[in-house]
């Protein structure tokens, strides 16, 4: 059809600008149709929709994509979201998805899956920036320069057994003498979140009054991960958006529903 590209562009624009409403609309369609529709979207648009979609539906979609597509999507999602999706899959489908993710991403997801849903252990970033306390500041600067993240606020200092010993702010790290061992420049004691803490305990933690991120620890204060304040707000926003989905539907109006549903039919 000569004008088919116009409705295609409109459909995917709606997908990009209204991911929550798109997620709720897509949930009403057969899984195979959803996969076909999303396969035509730009890779950066898919993760945002999956984040708001019913976990069972999103996980089923994920399991039907080719391995390369799965790997791209998982790489674009926070580990906590990927973990939640994998929990919704059967064991066979889950292992297939994890295999497609690659060893590094799969390892992160498996670590989160050891903890109950909605606990700090399941919501954390399982790859906190950390170095042993006997390393020096020069080594720490080199390490931090290689960390690929725009949200690094602190370097966590551990004992050689992996237990948390202290914390060092990035600014402090660059003001200290290069030859200083980390145990001399770190701050202690450290505000930390036990891995089995629930959402309410995480949100109410007094450490947020001082720090932009808090380490998550297991038995004997073994460092497991980190939750940043920005991620905490993001988690709460996702929950709030999902809880208030119906009022948002009415705000957007029936025209959105009609438009996206019929555009999907035209594309497929």
Spans of features found by a protein language model:
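Cytosolic regulatory modules rich in charged/polar residues
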Residues: 2-23, 29-33, 41-47, 52-60, ...
